[in-house]
Each structure stands twice: as structure tokens, then as C-alpha cells.
């Protein structure tokens, strides 16, 4: 059998899969395009990107993710609302049903790698019933060469069957959708959802379990490098600007979402990007915008005119969470090998919808650990006209849904690396200024870029700072090219007493959330706020 072949028979017996119909082995992009169109899975847009719809699930099914509770990993897992236990016998029963379902069906297999570091990468296999999910895997993971395929010894397998629905009362799931990780069997099973992000995030969870046990810091962050190789990493939850701010014309992109930090430096886990594209414009985000016009890109839930085949990135009729999946090589300025040195700067991004955090602030190491464990951002509660009450969101390590181990373990690793390499740390608010929604305005992307650039090139560090009286943050007195009054958030509010009340309210939210970490952190970190 040649790689990229279409074969009858199995070759998948090691996974318990017998009697499938056609198997598309590591098919190239063009073949997968043909299969997507032939099977009615999507449409080709006028400039070549593939448009698909995910149906009911347009985002992650957070309540439907489980980890099998088995002896090998049970004591290490941070069990709770995020990492829900699933009985081994229920997993075996459900998996047997899935293997029966696959009999007589066409399957798409992609053999690839997770992790750009030769020392830490793991060979992964994605088996799916959807051609476009195979293309997603091909975009998002690191592609194996023909020579590497000869020795590709799969360490973790994802079996993805969107049309296979669980029976909650029988199978022990919360709904018809499920994402279940079994560390003992090195297997992930996904069913009942077509949202492709589940594939990449399940392997991200696997890496977040495996690598820290080897002393490698795993991170939900983007990363880029300057002309001289100086590296910056950007932590942040979805919608805070990781992808946007790391795809900068004056820097080389290492990766946009998932990275490791070992003794040699930073390395990308992926071979592609998964960018939010709602209201994307060529002016504010030119690099990402151009990717939505390229062959090989998958546009998830983006509106398309079925006659002209033109897309509308401003149309949120399907979801606000429209996405583009594309190989990182679609970006013109990248670090080709996906690896960089030790970071010079750590930037923690937040989208503060209360409008009380500064656009940028310098953090002490203790403050950096506090904000890393807090993982704060805020979302607008509703879409009604007028003022809406923001909702604070705290997600430990800026990625709690994907962190299988205890947050303190990740924080300890990060703290040691920051101290060892004397890393400068910054907090950047890409959210509101002058008040929340309906009162203030969203921070301009151009302002955030200018502030980040000034931090990375040393301009801010060489200047003076003023101490914020509420959050204890060091705020720069000036930034070239920006109005000085926007740097201190209190100055932008017309009602200063309203600012004070809102800021202190947010401080109390921080304190309440941090109670869970006090027992495992130093007094210096616990007393930051």
C-alpha cells in the first residue's frame, strides 16, 4: 500500500476497526477537497477556501468532555467541573458501538505529529468519517513526510465520528455529543458533534497531561519572534487577541494557540492556525484576512452566497464563533521550524468588558503568577441595546478546559522559567476603555499593537511608570504615537466614582476566585490583590 492510497480492507485492526469500506490514507488537500464536494460536506468559495457548516454545535461542547478514570492517571488528574471522570467499562461499551458503526463505511486517516520539538513530539493518528475533518487535521497538526510515514508509530489516536450519536441513558454521557480521553489506551473518541475544534483541543489536553510530567511547560498561548530571534508569548482565552497580536507584520509567527517551553526554548504544538474571523478586516488583520482567500483554508460556519460563492465575514447568522483553519505556511512571515529560543517577554491578554484594567501594565513575577492562575477575561452578558452587565470569566492558566493536571503544577513550571530566564511580564487589556459596553469603547487593535510593539522593543521598559492604586499595577506614563490619557483607565472614565466602584468590584471577584489557590501558592503571590 502506498501512502495517500485509497484502499479497501482495513489496516486499522490495531484500533479494533474491522470491515470498513474505503480508507483514504493521509490523502493530500486536493483529494480531500474533491471528497468534500462529492459528499456534499461543503462548498468551494470563489477564491478557493472551503466553506463548511458544523450544524448544532458551533463551538466546543464543554459539558460533554470526559477523562476515563483509570488507575494509571487517576491520581494525577485535576478532577472537577472541567475534568469529569468517565468509567472505563462505559468507555469500552461506547467504543465497541463506534467500531460497529464504522463497519462498511468510508474512513479518512491522517497520520501526523503534535509538537515541533523532535524530542517531545508525539505521532498521532486521526480517523474520521468526514473528509473535511481529515483536512482540518492535515491543516492543524504537523504533516509527516513520506520518509517519516514509514516509521510513524502512532502514540495517540483520535476517532472522530460526527454522525454517531450517544444515548445518554445507556452510554453514561450528558448528551448525544461526547469527547472522551483515555490515557491508558492512548485513545480519544469524539461523537455527535461536527465542530472540528474538538479534534485539536483533545490532543492539546493530551499534551497538557504528558509534557509537564517531563518538566516541559505546556501553554495555551501564541508566540512570535523578532528579527534577532527574541521571542514573545501571548497567553489569553478565546477572543482576547492571541492570534491577532501574534500575527504581526514586523515579527515572525511561531504559532497562534498551543506551545511548549522546554530547556531549549519554545516550540509550537501545531502546524496550522484556527483563527476567529467574525468581522475580520484587511485593514486591521491583513495576514489572517488573506488566509480566508486561499486554497486549503477551511472556513467554519462562514456565510457564503451559493450562487456567486463569495463569503461574508461580517455575517454572524450561524454563529459569532466563525473560524478559519489553515496551514501556518499560509502566513508569509513565520518561523518555519516552529521553534524559538527562550522568551524575552510574556504577555497576558485579557478582554476586560468592565473597562477598568489599563491597556498595558508591567507585572512583577508574583503578579504574573497571580494573573496566570486567575486567567481573567470578561464577556458581555447579552446583546440587548443599551448598557449590559459584563460577566467575569476566570479560567486557570488561561486554558482551564484543556489543563488535565492541577493548576499549581503549570504555575510552578512557568514561575521557574520566568525567574531562570529573567523574562519581562506584561498584562494587556484588549477589551473596553472608559466604561463597559454601552458607555465606553473597545480598545482599538492599532492601539494594542502599538503598545505591544513598544513593550517588545524596549521602549516602555526604558520609560517611567506610575503605580495604579487599585490593582497595584505599573502603568507606563507614555507610549510613542498614542494619547497619554488612555494609558491610565481612570482618566478615560467621565464618572470617576463609577470607575472606583467598578474597579473595586472586579478586585473582589479576583479575590473570591483566588481563594482556591491560596493553599498552594506563596504568601507573596496570594497577596497580590
Swiss-Prot record:
Question: Which cofactors is this protein said to need?
Answer: Mn(2+)
Q: Name one GO biological process term.
A: gluconeogenesis
Pathway assigned in UniProt: Carbohydrate biosynthesis; gluconeogenesis
Chain residues that bind ATP: 201, 220, 236-244, 285, 323, 448
Give me the comment on cofactor binding. Answer: Binds 1 Mn(2+) ion per subunit.
* Annotated Mn(2+) binding sites: 201, 220, 257
Taxonomy, superkingdom: Bacteria
What GO molecular function terms would the record report?
A: ATP binding; metal ion binding; phosphoenolpyruvate carboxykinase (ATP) activity
Any one GO CC term of this protein is: cytosol
Catalysed reaction equations from the record? oxaloacetate + ATP = phosphoenolpyruvate + ADP + CO2
Task: Write out the annotated subcellular location.
Answer: Cytoplasm
Q: Which amino acid positions bind substrate, per UniProt?
A: 60, 195, 201, 323
Task: Give the keywords, sorted.
Answer: ATP-binding, Cytoplasm, Decarboxylase, Gluconeogenesis, Lyase, Manganese, Metal-binding, Nucleotide-binding
Q: What broad class of enzyme is this? A: lyase
Query: EC number(s) of the enzyme?
Result: 4.1.1.49
Among NCBIfam families, the record links this protein to: pckA (TIGR00224), PRK09344.1-2 (NF006820), PRK09344.1-3 (NF006821)
Instruction: Note the HAMAP family from the entry.
Output: PEPCK_ATP (MF_00453)
Family statement: Belongs to the phosphoenolpyruvate carboxykinase (ATP) family.
- Report the function annotation for this chain: Involved in the gluconeogenesis. Catalyzes the conversion of oxaloacetate (OAA) to phosphoenolpyruvate (PEP) through direct phosphoryl transfer between the nucleoside triphosphate and OAA.
- Protein name per Swiss-Prot or TrEMBL: Phosphoenolpyruvate carboxykinase (ATP)
Taxonomic lineage of this organism?
Answer: Bacteria, Pseudomonadati, Thermodesulfobacteriota, Desulfuromonadia, Geobacterales
Amino acid at each position: 500500500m502506498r501512502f495517500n492510497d485509497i484502499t479497501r480492507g482495513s489496516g486499522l485492526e490495531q484500533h479494533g476497526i474491522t470491515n470498513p469500506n474505503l480508507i483514504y490514507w493521509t490523502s493530500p488537500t486536493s483529494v480531500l477537497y474533491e471528497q468534500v464536494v462529492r459528499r456534499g460536506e461543503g462548498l468551494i468559495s470563489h477564491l478557493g477556501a472551503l466553506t463548511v457548516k458544523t450544524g448544532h454545535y458551533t463551538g466546543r461542547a464543554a459539558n460533554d468532555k470526559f477523562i476515563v478514570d483509570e488507575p494509571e492517571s487517576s491520581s494525577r488528574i485535576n478532577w472537577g467541573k472541567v475534568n469529569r471522570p468517565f468509567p472505563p467499562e462505559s468507555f469500552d461499551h461506547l467504543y465497541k458501538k463506534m467500531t460497529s458503526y464504522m463497519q462498511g463505511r468510508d474512513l479518512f486517516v491522517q497520520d501526523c505529529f503534535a509538537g515541533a520539538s523532535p524530542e517531545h513530539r508525539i505521532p498521532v493518528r486521526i480517523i474520521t468519517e468526514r473528509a473535511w475533518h481529515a483536512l482540518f487535521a492535515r491543516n492543524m497538526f504537523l504533516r509527516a513526510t513520506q520518509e517519516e510515514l514509514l516509521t510513524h508509530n502512532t502514540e495517540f489516536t483520535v476517532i472522530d465520528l460526527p454522525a454517531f450519536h450517544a444515548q445518554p441513558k445507556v452510554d453514561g454521557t450528558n448528551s448525544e455529543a461526547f469527547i472522551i480521553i483515555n490515557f491508558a489506551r492512548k485513545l480519544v473518541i469524539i461523537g455527535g458533534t461536527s465542530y472540528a475544534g474538538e479534534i485539536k483541543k483533545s490532543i492539546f489536553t493530551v499534551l497538557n497531561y504528558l509534557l509537564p510530567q517531563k518538566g516541559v511547560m505546556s501553554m495555551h498561548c501564541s508566540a512570535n519572534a523578532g528579527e534577532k530571534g527574541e521571542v514573545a508569548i501571548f497567553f489569553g482565552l478565546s477572543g482576547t487577541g492571541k492570534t491577532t497580536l501574534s500575527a504581526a507584520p514586523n515579527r515572525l509567527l511561531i504559532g497562534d494557540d498551543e506551545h511548549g517551553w522546554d530547556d531549549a526554548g519554545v516550540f509550537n504544538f501545531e502546524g496550522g492556525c484556527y483563527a476567529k474571523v467574525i468581522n475580520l478586516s484587511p485593514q486591521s488583520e491583513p495576514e489572517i484576512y488573506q488566509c480566508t482567500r486561499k486554497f486549503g483554508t477551511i472556513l467554519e460556519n462562514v456565510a457564503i452566497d451559493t450562487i456567486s460563492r463569495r463569503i461574508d465575514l461580517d455575517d454572524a447568522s450561524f454563529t459569532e464563533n466563525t473560524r478559519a483553519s489553515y496551514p501556518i505556511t499560509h502566513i508569509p512571515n513565520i518561523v518555519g521550524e516552529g521553534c524559538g529560543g527562550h522568551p524575552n517577554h510574556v504577555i497576558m491578554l485579557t478582554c476586560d468588558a468592565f473597562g477598568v484594567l489599563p491597556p498595558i501594565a508591567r507585572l512583577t513575577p508574583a503578579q504574573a503568577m497571580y494573573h496566570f492562575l486567575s486567567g481573567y477575561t470578561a464577556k458581555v452578558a447579552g446583546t440587548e441595546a443599551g448598557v449590559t452587565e459584563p460577566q467575569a470569566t476566570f479560567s486557570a492558566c488561561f486554558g482551564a478546559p484543556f489543563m488535565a493536571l492541577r493548576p499549581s503544577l503549570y504555575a510552578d513550571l512557568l514561575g521557574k522559567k520566568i525567574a531562570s530566564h529573567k523574562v519581562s511580564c506584561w498584562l494587556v487589556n484588549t477589551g473596553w476603555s472608559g466604561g463597559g459596553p454601552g458607555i465606553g469603547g473597545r480598545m482599538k487593535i492599532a492601539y494594542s499593537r502599538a503598545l505591544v510593539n513598544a513593550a517588545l522593543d524596549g521602549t516602555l521598559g526604558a520609560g517611567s511608570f506610575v503605580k495604579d492604586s487599585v490593582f497595584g499595577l505599573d502603568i507606563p506614563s507614555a507610549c510613542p504615537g498614542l494619547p497619554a490619557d488612555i494609558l491610565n483607565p481612570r482618566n478615560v472614565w467621565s464618572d470617576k466614582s463609577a470607575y472606583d466602584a467598578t474597579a473595586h468590584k472586579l478586585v473582589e471577584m479576583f479575590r473570591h476566585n483566588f481563594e482556591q489557590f491560596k493553599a498552594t501558592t506563596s504568601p507573596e503571590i496570594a497577596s497580590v490583590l
